[in-house]
Amino acid sequence: MQQALTFADVQSVKHLAKKLKQAHPELPHGKRLNLAAAELLGVRNYHELNRRFQAVIDQYLDSPSGPNAVAHCLYCDFRFAADLKGDQREHRENHERIMEVHEITGYRPGTYVEREAMKTDGYTKARSPGSLEDRIDGALLILRGWFDRSYHRAIDAGQWRKHPSFETYVALMVPYIEGIFPELAPSLAQRYGRTPGVIAHGQTNWPLQ
């Protein structure tokens, strides 16, 4: 097994273990997980698979030393006490949710720091004396920062499949943009459309269903 493990790899092993119950009804679930891990991924057992997958997750951790230190995952943006089992488990669940969406869609919503950087850059460009197109690009950066926060929220709620695409989200936000950048809103509406009434004025999160 040369490539880094994915969320889909682990799920495939779990699914095969369930199917193996028909061929090996005498084996407990743990033994069937071992068989599935060896058959699909060539590892010795499920414990080794789980250990390697945890290493894939942990590579993104920023873990300062010292008492009461808070670890921060630079991938899923989760902050937790790294020495607490419950926090470790909660981080893994959160990380796997983001990882699953990333693998399926090819898109990972930005972390808080990434979103704030996009918005800061966006406001600078949108308010600059540059060309209209450059200013529109700035507005789109702001919208991307808002979109990522909204999308992350939908992932946490298990509703990411229902969340609008970025293009649709822009159309939902045009009525709000009209109050912030009235000179840019018509161009955004022409490009993406204008859909009022879905996201409340002054809000930036798509309403969960």
What spans do the regions from the language model cover?
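C-terminal recognition-helix end and immediately following basic linker
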Residues: 84-106
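Short functional micro-motifs and their immediate structural scaffolds
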Residues: 81
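Generic structural signal for hydrophobic core residues of well-folded globular domains
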Residues: 20, 36-40, 53, 150, ...
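Short cysteine-rich clusters marking metal-coordination/redox-active sites
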Residues: 70-76
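C-terminal, charged low-complexity interaction regions
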Residues: 167-209
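Extended non-catalytic scaffold regions that mediate assembly and binding
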Residues: 46, 51, 57-64, 69, ...
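C-terminal alpha-helical interaction appendages
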Residues: 1-69
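Long, charge-rich boundary regions
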Residues: 103-168
